Amino acid sequence: MNGKEIFLVGLSHKSAPIEVRERVALTGDLLKAALCELRAAESVAEAFVVSTCNRVEVYVQADGIEPARRFFTERAPDADEHLYAKIGVEAIRHLFRVSASLDSMVVGEQQILGQVKEAYGLASAAEAAGPFMSRLCNRAFATAKRVRTETDIGRGATSMSQVAVELVEKIFGDLKGRAILLVGAGKMGALSAKALAVLGADRILVTNRSPERGLALAEQVGGAFRGWDELPRLLVEADVVIVSTGAPTYVVTRDLVQQAMKARRRRSLCLIDLAVPRNVDPACADLGEVFAYDVDDMEKVVTATQEARRGEALRAEAIVEAEVMAFAKERDARAALPVLAQLRRHAEQIARAEAERTLSHLGPKLDEKGKKSVEAMAQAIVNKLLHGPTARLKAAAATGDGDLPGAAAELFGIDNDPARPEGAPAQPAEGRAAASSERS
């Protein structure tokens, strides 16, 4: 480590309504720009951002939490009351639980791991995530894989798309003959289409801005592709519309639905919006015979499935906790390494200087063998003197006593900054104390 701590600031379906989440959700170039902005902060060493339909979370390795908090308040000034913040082991535990889908609206859902992997990949490509985030994220991914392999937490409806399809089935019963329109052919759209096909839906319509992607999905599920410009007419034809595009604004507007309802002659229309930011104008729900649901409404459908999965979730929590403690122990042990390296370098410099002074006094009295004996003796003294302190520093770090390595650095007047180039002068003890005071 580099003297910095890991901080997490975020909001999720548990802490904030969709109206707040959609204002801070970022994708594509906007997310890349946000990563660069975070990394540019002087106090931030590494960063990555998880942004999904149910959560936006900022992880930073930094001197303090403010850069992560500012990410939210600059985008949504009223977000502060919905934020949660975690530091150190608590932040590590949270990421592990999120990756293992234990903090998801649908516990056991499979999409979140891919989303966190994608978030880390983007941060790595933007050079915002470095060696610490690499170790952290890869350990979180391995933990999620253990949970998936060693428990049955993934049984039943395990994605928002599957939950949406379950809702459709509850409303209509038999799906045969029902016209179901999928607006968007991305991951959510594909999962919805496959779940519908399994339940026997035989009139699946797909529309997408990119015809190639839409055609491919329609062929996979035996559906029909329609052009994006046909959306107004498709809203007249469909019984159910499931919307999940990457658009940052409403795709299905109130005016569009109002016009469609005039032509439907009092036939009800079910709108399910799986996107964040929302793609269906919430004002559509005010229209007669229109039943609109967004991702927050899905939580009511999820409850029964969650109860059946409670036992597996407890087993998964135990796996996560064991992995968190193991990672934290390794992290703390690493914290001692820079101190140990500097302590040994400091001692060896003194030993070499004293050996050279002794040899210069003895002059020609010593042959080459005698000189080597003096140098070997100096190194042996260093090794014996440092053996005990080295063992105690490693043990202290491994048991979470993070104060001892810092105290050792202060006691011996050595630099505990791994970012300092090799051979550069160490910062004086009083300078380090002042810098530490400024950060706190």
Curated annotation (Swiss-Prot):
Its EC number is 1.2.1.70. Residues 406-440 are annotated as: Disordered. NADP(+) binds at residues 184-189. It catalyses: (S)-4-amino-5-oxopentanoate + tRNA(Glu) + NADP(+) = L-glutamyl-tRNA(Glu) + NADPH + H(+). Substrate binds at residues 52-55, 104, 109-111, 115. Pathway: Porphyrin-containing compound metabolism; protoporphyrin-IX biosynthesis; 5-aminolevulinate from L-glutamyl-tRNA(Glu): step 1/2. Keywords: NADP, Oxidoreductase, Porphyrin biosynthesis. GO terms for biological process: protoporphyrinogen IX biosynthetic process from glutamate. The record marks 94 as: Important for activity. PROSITE patterns: GLUTR (PS00747). One of its GO terms (molecular function) is NADP binding. It comes from the Bacteria. Possesses an unusual extended V-shaped dimeric structure with each monomer consisting of three distinct domains arranged along a curved 'spinal' alpha-helix. The N-terminal catalytic domain specifically recognizes the glutamate moiety of the substrate. The second domain is the NADPH-binding domain, and the third C-terminal domain is responsible for dimerization. Belongs to the glutamyl-tRNA reductase family. This is Glutamyl-tRNA reductase 1. The lineage of its organism: Bacteria, Pseudomonadati, Myxococcota, Myxococcia, Myxococcales. The gene is hemA1.
